[in-house]
Amino acid sequence: MNKNNLIGNYTIALFNNAMVDNIQDKVFEEITSINSIITDNVDIREFLFSPIVNKNDKIKAINSLAKNTKINTIVYNFLLLLIKNFRMTILSDIISVFNKLLCESKNIKIVQVISANKLKPKEQEWIKSHIEKELNQKTEILFDIDSNIIGGIVIKYDSMLQDYSIKGSLDKITKVLKKVNINT
């Protein structure tokens, strides 16, 4: 089974379990929090991701983590399932897909906005309001930074790409100039 199918299957199972009790938001919040603890702590991450560490020791670690964070039974059982099946390494990917499912269930479109520098909160709000107005839909904006675009922004959602960057403009100009045949 390829990795994307595997991630999709685990995510759908988790999402459906959360839907039964109508706690999708809570499950997302808890599993994201647990993932942050794991990714922020190198020792925990290496311990849980290591194929050498005994499965029972990993389960004890999850039990301890669950006790300290008071996580929901669904999240707890899901983490145990990942441990038992040696799948903890795909937790971040599962969370990403879970977020997409959560947004789809609320009719919220996920939009990625790439800028050359970190945008100020007012700029982020302005961009969000204009995108929501253009799409006539609520959005969740993921702001990323890529200094290669030089300036401006690039907006991505679904299969759409709107390039308002300086690099994009320069690339278009370069493409046009290459097409122009200059004979002297």
Swiss-Prot record:
Q: What's the protein here called?
A: ATP synthase subunit delta
Q: Which organism is it from?
A: Rickettsia canadensis (strain McKiel)
Quaternary state and partners of this protein?
Answer: F-type ATPases have 2 components, F(1) - the catalytic core - and F(0) - the membrane proton channel. F(1) has five subunits: alpha(3), beta(3), gamma(1), delta(1), epsilon(1). F(0) has three main subunits: a(1), b(2) and c(10-14). The alpha and beta chains form an alternating ring which encloses part of the gamma chain. F(1) is attached to F(0) by a central stalk formed by the gamma and epsilon chains, while a peripheral stalk is formed by the delta and b chains.
Keywords assigned by UniProt, alphabetized: ATP synthesis, Cell inner membrane, Cell membrane, CF(1), Hydrogen ion transport, Ion transport, Membrane, Transport
The family database entries (InterPro entries) matched by this protein are listed as: ATP_synth_OSCP/delta_N_sf, ATPase_OSCP/dsu
HAMAP family (alphabetical): ATP_synth_delta_bact
Q: Which GO terms describe its molecular function?
A: proton-transporting ATP synthase activity, rotational mechanism
Membrane topology category:
Peripheral membrane protein
Q: Where in the cell is it found?
A: Cell inner membrane
Q: What does this protein do?
A: F(1)F(0) ATP synthase produces ATP from ADP in the presence of a proton or sodium gradient. F-type ATPases consist of two structural domains, F(1) containing the extramembraneous catalytic core and F(0) containing the membrane proton channel, linked together by a central stalk and a peripheral stalk. During catalysis, ATP synthesis in the catalytic domain of F(1) is coupled via a rotary mechanism of the central stalk subunits to proton translocation. This protein is part of the stalk that links CF(0) to CF(1). It either transmits conformational changes from CF(0) to CF(1) or is implicated in proton conduction.
- A cellular component annotation (GO) from this entry: proton-transporting ATP synthase complex
Q: Which family does it belong to?
A: Belongs to the ATPase delta chain family.
